[in-house]
Amino acid sequence: IIRAAVALVAELPEHMIRIISPDIGGGFGNKVPVYPGYVCSILASILLERPVKWIEDKSGNLISTGFARDVYLDGEMALRRDGKILGVRIHTDADHGAFFSDAQPSKFKIGLMHSAFAAYDIPAAHLTARGTYTNKAPGGVAYRCSFRVTEAMFFQERMVQAAADDLGMDQAEFRRMNFVR
C-alpha cells in the first residue's frame, strides 16, 4: 500500500521504489496510513538521489502514529411497558486528534450507525456526532475492529441491559423479543 501511494505521489514507476520492513504481522491499523516520517524520508531520498534509512523506535511510534478510540457515547431508548424497543437516540463525541489520519472523517459515524443496534428491530433511530480536533496524535486509525463496531456493540448491549433492568425483565428475554426477525 505504501509503495503504491509513494509511486503515485512521487510520479515514479512502482518498481523503482523499494520499501524494506521487517515482518510485523498483519496489515491493519497503524500500518495503513502514510505518516509524515515516510514522506520526509522519501523526499530526502529523491533529493539526495540515494537510499535513505528511516528508523522509528517504539516510543516514537506511539507518539506519532494514530489512535482509534477516544469516544464518548450517550443515548436514550424509547420503550413500551412490555419491553418492545420503539426507538433510540444516540450522541457521540469523538476525538480525532490533530488530524484525521484516514482522510474519511465520516467513516466513524457511518460505521457507528450501521453497527449500533443492528441486531435489534428498532423502528426509529437518530444519531448525532461531533468530531473534535485536539493536540493528540492523529485519530481515526482502525485496529482490532473496523468502523467502530467494538464501541457500538458495547454501547448497544449496555443500553439493552439497562433497559431490561429498568423494566425488571430478564435480559435474555428482553433481547429475544427485540431481535430482528
Model-found features: residue ranges?
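Structured beta-strand/loop patches that form or line metal/cofactor-binding pockets in enzymes
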Residues: 52-75
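Alpha-helical support elements that line or immediately flank enzyme active sites
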Residues: 1-24, 28-48, 104-117, 144-178
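General beta-strand structural signal in soluble alpha/beta enzymes
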Residues: 18-21, 54-56, 86-90, 176
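Short, solvent-exposed polar/charged micro-motifs at secondary-structure junctions
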Residues: 27-31, 63-67, 99
